[in-house]
From Swiss-Prot:
Protein topology in the membrane: Peripheral membrane protein
UniProt gene name: INP1
Function according to Swiss-Prot or TrEMBL: Required for peroxisome inheritance.
Lineage: Eukaryota, Fungi, Dikarya, Ascomycota, Saccharomycotina
GO biological process, one term: peroxisome inheritance
Name of the molecule in the record: Inheritance of peroxisomes protein 1
Family: Belongs to the INP1 family.
Location(s), subcellular: Peroxisome membrane
Keyword ATP-binding: no
């Protein structure tokens, strides 16, 4: 028996068929993408026109887009090429080589600092490091490592042109055939020529812990370095950074023979002293009355000591004076006495003797001794106090 069929049931779409995606034709997809791009470009052009009208000035990029849309295809290609050439020319950098030498040995020195416990120890250690003299001695005390045993050294500049402004110049020092190490040469960089060790230069950067030593070597089979190489290196770095040479140090000033020496007058001046016999002793290098004492001196120091000793011998202390002179009458009068005889006073002196000084002995007690101690002194007595 045949089962009845329902025409309405045959027209119903099963639920699983609703989830299936409809087939999209390739032509419609390409057309839709093209229309979207066209609408995007139109929106950009309309926004640029609106902003230029409202702001009072037109953006350069949007103006270029408008002009590009209004030009023919041939003019568009030439315009794009001109823009690209301008951009390449503005961003191009020129490299200029200032110096290059193929045989150089470079050693890097790094100072070894101890780890301090507190800030006070680190400050004192830093002061000791700063007080040390910079030079080859400091380089020897640091840890050394060879960064270029034998290779080329090049100094070049990168010149960047800028429109309506002076071009920028940056100098670099390059080591190695493949430019493994590049170091900028700044105006504060210090390069010193180490003449005591040969054709060597020290390069001190901002960091005092790190420094380089550059040594120029001869070519293979030749130990001599041409002089023009050193001159070219000096001319290349002296106008860029701080370059100093030990040959330019101030010479040591020679000690003068007449004005600078404080004791020179003892050798060239005449000393006239009166002895018991009344003879004069003259100390002079050329005219000396005692050649056996002065001419036998081998050095200048001995001559100075001899002259100083002779000058001291003629200065007698008060305690070494004879007892007769110590107990004699010391007169402050204007009348002079020679060998007990009175001499006429000088014409400008007063004829009257005002006072005399007589020795006086006093006794005093000392804390260190139980016996009295006699003290000798002088007492001035005026003649007005003495009754005739």
């Amino acid at each position: 028996m045949a089962r009845p069929t329902n025409s309405a049931a045959s027209d119903v779409i099963p639920p699983s068929s609703k989830t299936r995606m409809p087939k999209i034709k390739p032509f419609k997809t390409i057309r839709t993408t093209f229309l979207k791009k066209k609408n995007t470009i139109g929106n950009l052009v309309s926004k640029g026109t609106h902003s230029s009208q409202s702001g009072g000035h037109k953006d350069s990029y949007m103006g270029d887009v408008e002009s590009l849309t209004l030009r023919s295809p041939q003019s568009r290609g030439s315009w794009v090429e001109s823009i690209d050439s301008k951009k390449i020319h503005s961003l191009s950098n020129d490299r200029v080589t200032l110096f290059r030498y193929e045989h150089v040995r470079v050693t890097s020195y790094q100072s070894v600092r101890k780890k301090y416990r507190n800030s006070g120890d680190s400050r004192r250690g830093q002061e000791r490091m700063e007080s040390a003299v910079k030079g080859t001695d400091v380089l020897r005390r640091e840890r050394a490592s060879v960064i270029e045993p034998r290779g080329p050294l090049e100094i070049y500049q990168i010149i960047t042109p800028i429109s309506k402004e002076p071009s920028q110049k940056v100098t670099y020092l390059c080591l190695g055939r493949k430019e493994q190490i590049i170091k900028p040469i700044l105006p504060k960089l210090r390069i010193t020529m180490l003449t005591r060790e040969g054709l060597q230069f020290s390069v001190l950067s901002f960091n005092p812990e790190n420094s380089w030593k550059i040594e120029f070597l001869g070519a293979l089979g030749d130990s001599a370095v041409p002089c023009n190489v050193i001159l070219a290196f000096e001319n290349a770095v002296k106008n860029i950074c701080r370059y100093t040479s030990e040959l330019n140090n101030d010479p040591i000033e020679e000690v003068g023979t007449e004005d600078d020496d404080d004791l020179e007058y003892l050798l060239y001046s005449d000393f006239a002293e009166d002895d018991d016999t009344g003879s004069d002793i003259t100390l002079n290098r050329e005219h000396s009355s005692e050649p056996s004492d002065l001419l036998n001196c081998s050095t200048t120091n001995e001559m100075i000591n001899d002259a100083f000793r002779k000058a001291i011998e003629h200065i007698r202390h008060v305690g070494s004076m004879p007892l007769i002179e110590a107990h004699g009458v010391k007169s402050f009068s204007s009348q002079l006495k020679i060998d007990g005889e009175q001499v006429d006073p000088p014409p400008k002196a007063s004829p009257r003797q005002r006072a005399v000084s007589v020795p006086v002995e006093t006794r005093t007690w000392s804390k260190l001794s139980t016996h009295p101690v006699a003290l000798s002194t002088w007492m001035d007595i005026e003649y007005d106090d003495i009754k005739e």
